[in-house]
Amino acid sequence: MAECSTLESLIEMGFSSTRAEKALTATGNQGIEPAMDWLVEHEDDPDIDEPSVVVPEGSSTDTADTTDTTDTTDTQGMDTSAERLPLTEEEKEKQTKRMMELVAQKQNEREEREKKERIEQEKQRRKHGQELSAIKQKMQEQEMQKAAEDRRREKQEEKMARERVREKIARDKADRARRFGGASSEPISPPAETSIPATTPSPSSPVQEPPTKKEYDQCRIQVRLLDGSALSQTFRAREQLAAVRLYVELNWPGGPPGPFSLLTSFPQRVFTEEDMEKPLQELGLVPTAVLIVAKK
């Protein structure tokens, strides 16, 4: 009768008979409080409202034994029922109230526990997000710092290269000034090789021999750029063609648009990288020459 009383109490508290029977079976009929604890913990189970599994039928002997046991239990239950007095309405009300308070307490405890778990999960999520943001920001700062260092290094290398070029040009100018008394900065008109002033030889004048070919120490180079403009400069006859190319690169308005070649139209010739190491005299560019710039 105690089990029936507990089952009835659970049903009176609003639980279905299926849930109440499951709770009592799962807790071994230990009383209302264990059953209530079980119901609170398993109220969200998907099979909470499914009927309990029925024990399969056994042999005829087992059936008979079960029948005998059932009869005995019923007899004992009847005896117990006769001995136990039913609860009064006031007792039922008190018991129900106490059980409802227990249910509310269990629910509050569960909600508080779930709330703490959610707060902890949110803390972990935020902490993880902050760590990722810090790592990302650090990587961006490192990339920006590296890019700035690369730009500073490139600018320094460009500055040093320009200084070397300026120093070389200054040395070349000083060398030309030392050799030719500063005449290298002034345009030099090419001397006529075959023009000889006409003179009337006197009968007593000796016969003049043909002039020997003159060796030139300087040459005047004019370079025509892609836009039709021209650059002119005087170079030593023994300077390499690379000096002319360097002069063009440094004095091209706005800088050269890209790699270029030097050529002559008559005779038609495109100068190679190997020619850049040869002196102007050897390339036939003395005493004057016109070079044309062409894109590679």
Curated annotation (Swiss-Prot):
Bias-annotated ranges (Low complexity): 61-75, 191-206
Signal peptide: none
Compositional bias ranges of the Basic and acidic residues kind: 86-100, 107-123, 138-178
Source taxon at top rank: Eukaryota
Any GO CC annotation of this UniProt entry: cytoplasm
Annotated GO MF terms: K48-linked polyubiquitin modification-dependent protein binding
Gene Ontology biological process terms from the UniProt entry: negative regulation of proteasomal ubiquitin-dependent protein catabolic process; negative regulation of protein K48-linked deubiquitination; negative regulation of protein ubiquitination
Domain UBA: from-to ranges: 1-42
Location in or out of the cell: Cytoplasm
Keywords assigned: Coiled coil, Cytoplasm
Gene3D superfamilies tied to this protein: DNA helicase RuvA subunit, C-terminal domain, Phosphatidylinositol 3-kinase Catalytic Subunit, Chain A, domain 1
All copies of domain UBX, residue ranges: 214-293
Function (record text): Component of a complex required to couple deglycosylation and proteasome-mediated degradation of misfolded proteins in the endoplasmic reticulum that are retrotranslocated in the cytosol. Involved in ubiquitin-proteasome systems.
Protein name: UBX domain-containing protein 1-A
Organism: Xenopus laevis
